[in-house]
C-alpha cells in the first residue's frame, strides 16, 4: 500500500542520522490477560496506564509494559534471553526477594562481583531480572554467577503455574511493598553478534558500552540493549509480541523511516491509529521486532490508518524479515 507519507519518507535524504528520543514501552505476550493484570499490578507494583479490549499497559518505575494474549513468544523454558531488567536498591532487593516468595513466584538470587541479582518469570514465562549494583548487605550469602564459578542457573525451574487466588492471600496489607527504581535493560538474542553490534550502533545510533564473552551492550536513546548469541529466541515471524518501542520526535520520524530503508531495513508503512500519532514497525537482522512511536505528528493525517481503527491497513509482520550483511 502506498501512502503520501511513505512517498515523503523515501524522498528524504540521509544527510544527518536521525535519532530516537527515548524508550516508549516493552510489549510482551501472555497466556492469560486477566492473570497477567493481577501479576503486574500486585507483584510488580504496576500502575494501570492504558486498557482496551485484548491489550493492557502498566507503568512500572519509568517504563510502560504492554501485555496481550498470544499463543507463544515468551522466553523459552530453558532460555535466558530475552529478559527484562529493573534496577532497585539494597533495601528493596531484600524486600522484593521476600515479596516474590510471599506471592509464590519461584526466583533465583545470585551475585556477580558486587552486584546482587534475582531472576524470576511472570506466569506466562517472560523472564525478568532484578539488578542491585550496590548497597545489599546480604550479598555474600548469595551464590556466585555461573561465569564467576557458581552453579548453572536452572531457568526451567523458574516456570510455574500461578495460583493467583492463593498467592499473596496472607500478606499483611500494612507490609512495606518493594519499589523498583528504573528500567535497567532489555537483553535480546541475536544470531550474529558482530552483525548485531554494527546494526545497533551504525543504524540505530547506539553506543557500544560493553563487549565480552559472547555478550554486548549498546546504549540506544538512553536505554541499554543487551545482545547475545547465548540460547534464546526472537519475536516469531508472524507475531507482534514481544516488541520494543522507541520514541521519535516529529522532526525525526519520517527521516528515521528513510534512514532505516536506506540502510537495508524493511519497514511497514508509516501508519496511525488516530490521525495524530505516528507508528512504524521494523525488525533487527535477527528478527526482534521494534516499533517507532511519535506521540504527535502533523503528517499522521496522511498516514495509513490501521484496520482495527477503521482503516484498511493491515500489518504483514512476516514480510518484515530481511537479510542484512553479516
Task: Give residue spans per PLM region.
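Hydrophobic, helix-prone linear segments
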Residues: 1-64, 71-72, 184
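Vicinal oxygen chelate
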Residues: 2-17, 23-31, 59, 75-99, 102-179, 262-326, ...
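Conserved acetyl-CoA-binding loop of GNAT-fold acetyltransferases
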Residues: 42-48, 105, 203-208, 265
Amino acid at each position: 500500500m502506498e501512502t503520501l507519507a511513505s512517498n515523503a519518507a523515501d524522498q528524504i535524504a540521509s544527510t544527518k542520522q536521525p535519532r530516537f528520543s527515548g524508550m516508549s514501552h516493552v510489549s510482551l505476550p501472555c497466556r492469560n490477560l486477566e492473570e497477567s493484570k493481577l501479576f503486574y499490578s500486585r507483584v510488580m507494583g504496576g500502575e494501570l496506564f492504558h486498557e482496551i479490549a485484548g491489550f493492557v499497559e502498566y507503568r512500572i518505575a519509568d517504563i510502560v509494559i504492554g501485555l496481550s494474549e498470544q499463543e507463544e513468544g515468551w522466553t523459552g523454558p530453558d532460555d535466558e534471553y530475552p529478559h527484562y531488567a529493573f534496577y532497585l536498591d539494597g533495601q528493596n532487593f531484600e524486600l522484593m526477594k521476600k515479596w516474590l516468595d510471599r506471592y509464590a513466584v519461584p526466583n533465583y538470587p545470585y551475585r556477580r562481583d558486587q552486584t546482587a541479582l534475582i531472576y524470576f518469570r511472570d506466569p506466562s514465562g517472560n523472564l525478568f531480572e532484578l539488578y542491585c549494583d550496590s548497597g545489599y548487605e546480604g550479598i555474600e550469602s548469595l551464590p556466585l554467577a555461573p561465569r564467576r564459578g557458581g552453579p548453572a542457573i536452572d531457568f526451567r525451574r523458574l516456570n510455574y503455574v500461578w495460583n493467583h487466588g492463593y498467592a499473596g492471600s496472607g500478606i499483611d496489607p500494612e507490609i512495606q511493598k518493594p519499589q523498583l527504581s528504573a528500567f535497567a535493560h532489555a537483553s535480546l538474542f541475536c544470531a550474529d553478534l558482530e552483525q548485531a553490534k554494527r546494526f545497533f550502533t551504525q543504524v540505530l545510533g547506539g553506543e557500544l558500552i560493553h563487549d565480552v564473552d559472547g555478550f554486548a551492550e549498546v546504549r540506544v536513546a538512553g536505554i541499554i540493549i543487551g545482545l547475545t548469541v547465548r540460547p534464546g529466541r526472537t519475536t516469531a515471524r508472524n507475531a507482534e509480541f514481544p516488541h520494543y518501542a522507541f520514541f521519535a520526535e516529529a522532526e525525526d520520524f519520517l527521516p528515521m523511516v528513510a534512514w532505516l530503508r536506506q540502510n537495508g531495513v524493511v519497514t511497514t508503512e508509516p501508519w496511525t491509529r488516530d490521525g495524530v500519532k505516528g507508528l512504524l514497525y521494523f525488525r533487527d537482522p535477527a528478527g526482534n521486532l521494534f516499533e517507532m512511536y511519535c506521540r504527535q505528528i502533523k503528517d499522521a493525517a496522511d498516514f495509513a490508518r490501521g484496520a482495527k481503527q477503521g482503516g484498511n491497513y493491515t500489518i504483514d509482520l512476516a514480510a518484515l524479515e530481511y537479510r542484512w550483511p553479516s
